[in-house]
């Protein structure tokens, strides 16, 4: 009997825990479990199938004659495939095992800087997105008047030798890992982490709040861990800051600004405003009953675009040390907004609320413990 491809985003498994990414015996262990790969060995391929490595490429029951037929068919189509490939852009992403994009190890870091990827200082964002499920969205934003300006601004930053983070291969990291149809929860951050974990290794990795393995846990993420422990969603705080397992379970983690400059906060916030707004609109218009988690003023502003009757919104102050214990005054969602006071981050069971809502919609809850 042939095996079925296993989708790591599937809700069909009734188990409460997802496949383990880290060893339960040693949370400091940074060894990568390469159990999930992108079936995309050529960077020029547009396909991005996710499957488990222990699955056979062919059926156990496949006959020898069927195998020969496939071999002949493959040889016949080889030339045509090559000619098609030549017409495609040479993608800068998609040629790695998928876990290398989200299980990044600071002690084994191989991602290139912006100037290494675009030595001519001409940024082409389309080369940084390989998951085909997002191509419709990207085609839409490419038609907008702001998009050429966005690429021009990023190109000008390179000409000025700004050290942009995250690095290009990681810019659309969450999008490249998680297809839009598998998103359950959207957690909005504000700005990529601006600093370096060690020399040549930025904290920023294209997933809000997450950092590479063997990097110190940032204070905002430490406060998130404290909240998880407080409401019994986590046994103890991990010694790493990698949130890969959340993403693989359907948590879409982005910042309102996709880039910043190394050691500087907020400098590219306006650069990405229109792009991020269109991304939120795309999700809210094309998908139903998503959960949006708005921490802080920037995330709240973006979520004012979300229809609260169609989607579920959880709002509080930001988990940063400066606001984690403070309430936040802003406007309510929906038509006829009024000034309201939102609770402090540390007073809300964010992750419990998420799972309660998922269960109420017969969706598999997120296993938050790392």
From Swiss-Prot:
GO MF annotation list: uracil DNA N-glycosylase activity
One of the GO BP terms on file: base-excision repair, AP site formation via deaminated base removal
Keyword Secreted tagged: no
EC number(s) given by UniProt: 3.2.2.-
Positions annotated as active site in the UniProt record: 191 (proton acceptor)
Keywords associated with the record: DNA damage, DNA repair, Hydrolase
PROSITE patterns: U_DNA_GLYCOSYLASE
PANTHER family, sorted: URACIL-DNA GLYCOSYLASE
Protein name, per record: Probable uracil-DNA glycosylase
UniProt organism field: Acanthamoeba polyphaga mimivirus (APMV)
């Amino acid at each position: 009997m042939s095996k079925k491809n296993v989708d790591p985003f599937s809700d069909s498994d009734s188990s409460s825990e997802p496949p383990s990414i880290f060893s339960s015996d040693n949370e400091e262990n940074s060894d990568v479990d390469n159990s999930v790969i992108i079936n995309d060995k050529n960077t020029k391929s547009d396909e991005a199938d996710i499957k488990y490595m222990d699955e056979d490429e062919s059926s156990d029951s496949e006959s020898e004659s069927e195998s020969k037929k496939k071999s002949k068919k493959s040889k016949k189509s080889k030339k045509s495939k090559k000619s098609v490939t030549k017409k495609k852009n040479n993608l800068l992403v998609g040629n790695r095992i998928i876990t290398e994009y989200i299980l990044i190890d600071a002690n084994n870091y191989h991602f290139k800087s912006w100037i290494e990827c675009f030595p001519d200082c001409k940024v082409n964002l389309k080369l940084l997105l390989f998951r085909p499920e997002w191509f419709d969205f990207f085609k839409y934003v490419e038609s907008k008047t702001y998009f050429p300006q966005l690429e021009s601004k990023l190109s000008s930053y390179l000409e000025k030798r700004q050290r942009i983070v995250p690095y290009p291969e990681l810019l659309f990291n969450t999008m490249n890992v998680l297809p839009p149809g598998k998103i359950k929860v959207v957690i909005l951050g504000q700005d990529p982490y601006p600093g370096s974990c060690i020399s040549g290794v930025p904290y920023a990795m294209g997933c809000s709040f997450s950092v590479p393995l063997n990097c110190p846990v940032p204070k905002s993420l430490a406060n998130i861990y404290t909240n998880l422990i407080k409401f019994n969603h986590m046994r103890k705080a991990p010694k790493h800051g990698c949130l890969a397992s959340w993403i693989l379970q359907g948590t879409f983690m982005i910042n309102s600004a996709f880039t910043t400059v190394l050691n500087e906060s907020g400098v590219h916030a306006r650069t990405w405003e229109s792009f991020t707004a269109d991304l939120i609109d795309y999700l809210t218009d094309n998908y139903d009953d998503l959960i949006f988690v708005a921490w802080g003023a920037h995330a709240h502003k973006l979520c004012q675009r979300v229809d609260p009757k169609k989607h579920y919104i959880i709002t509080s102050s930001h988990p940063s040390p400066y606001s984690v214990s403070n309430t936040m005054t802003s406007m309510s969602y929906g038509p006829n907004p009024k000034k309201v006071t939102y609770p402090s981050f540390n007073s809300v069971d964010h992750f419990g609320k998420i799972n309660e809502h998922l269960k109420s919609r017969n969706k598999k809850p997120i296993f938050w413990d790392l």
